Amino acid sequence: MALKYLLDTSVIKRLSRPAVRRAVEPLAEAGAVARTQITDLEVGYSARNETEWQRLMVALSAFDLIESTASHHRRALGIQRLLAARSQRGRKIPDLLIAAAGEEHGLVVLHYDADFDLIAAVTGQPCQWIVPAGTID
């Protein structure tokens, strides 16, 4: 299967939850999911030491990597402007970059973060909750 989905950090950080794992595993096994470089940075930020950081990076390598580009940054700025026009400022910069990468590559952003509903409302891009909102936190 070709790439179809882009994982947000909100999904990756919840892979220990059975419902999230059940949703992601078949997609990962089919080679249908990717992650972005900003996601690697977000996940690596939580590492308490080098050993844990290395373990996290190895785990992330199970997903294809979408490299950050200048066009992602330009689009993230554009999305930020569209949100500001609606007085919906304050969306996290990593979310804007992930959304921009997903949009450019024609991928559905899989998330567990309401910010993506706001982003999708201005971009029209496909975003999907990995499990229904409010069911695991």
Swiss-Prot record:
Taxonomy of the source species: Bacteria, Bacillati, Actinomycetota, Actinomycetes, Mycobacteriales
PINc domain sequence ranges: 5-120
Positions contributing to Mg(2+) binding: D8, D95
Entry EC number(s): 3.1.-.-
GO molecular function, one term: RNA endonuclease activity
Function: Toxic component of a type II toxin-antitoxin (TA) system. An RNase. Its cognate antitoxin is VapB51.
Keyword Nuclease: yes
HAMAP family assigned: VapC_Nob1
Family of the protein in this entry: Belongs to the PINc/VapC protein family.
Top EC category: hydrolase
The keyword Translocase is assigned to this record: no
Protein name in the entry: Ribonuclease VapC51
Keywords: Hydrolase, Magnesium, Metal-binding, Nuclease, Toxin-antitoxin system
Cofactor(s) the protein needs: Mg(2+)
